[in-house]
From Swiss-Prot:
EC number assigned by the record: 3.6.5.2
Cofactor list: Mg(2+)
Protein name, entry field: Ras-related protein Rab-39B
Lineage: Eukaryota, Metazoa, Chordata, Craniata, Vertebrata
Function recorded in the entry: The small GTPases Rab are key regulators of intracellular membrane trafficking, from the formation of transport vesicles to their fusion with membranes. Rabs cycle between an inactive GDP-bound form and an active GTP-bound form that is able to recruit to membranes different sets of downstream effectors directly responsible for vesicle formation, movement, tethering and fusion. RAB39B is involved in autophagy and may function in autophagosome formation.
Major site of localization recorded for this protein: membrane
Family listed: Belongs to the small GTPase superfamily. Rab family.
Superkingdom, natural source: Eukaryota
InterPro entries with a match to the protein in the record: P-loop_NTPase, Rab39, Rab_GTPases_membrane_traffic, Small_GTP-bd, Small_GTPase
Modified residues (Phosphoserine): 201
GN (gene name): RAB39B
Binding site for Mg(2+): 22, 40, 64
Keyword Iron: no
Amino acid sequence: MEAIWLYQFRLIVIGDSTVGKSCLIRRFTEGRFAQVSDPTVGVDFFSRLVEIEPGKRIKLQIWDTAGQERFRSITRAYYRNSVGGLLLFDITNRRSFQNVHEWLEETKVHVQPYQIVFVLVGHKCDLDTQRQVTRHEAEKLAAAYGMKYIETSARDAINVEKAFTDLTRDIYELVKRGEITIQEGWEGVKSGFVPNVVHSSEEVVKSERRCLC
């Protein structure tokens, strides 16, 4: 039987090819690091439950997207139905950092009229001696776009949990404040299953009818 969860958040992980998107997701969802990882073709799907507060769990649907240009038309279709995302670059590959702006602009075009909460992720921080992007300039770019910045390593399991849980908590706070709402026809946020809780007026009416019988 599936564990109980309060909400389901659909997340998307984007960035250039070879920045380590699949490795990061597999470390988070499966607890393992693959030394050799085949390039993602189109989109792959993963899921995991995260407990953000005692007794409050969020189900994450995580979409791993291909970074190659020839798959962009496929991955763009998933932007609109995502509420959050990790935007990855490789700290040893300056070009992948320079392309962050392009990824963000592309996302803005395809998510309308909704919004995506992003965290900027500098991946492969275990290769610090090969760094081509300083933490300072990455933090500056993230601040310019209103994003958090975090550095991770799938190989050494550094900040992998933190990247996903911080993003989940940020989305959860926006949902609690009513700044992000569940909307018909949008898959970004869905209400979960909580026992002994009436979720709609229709359910109340059904309950009252049963009592009158």
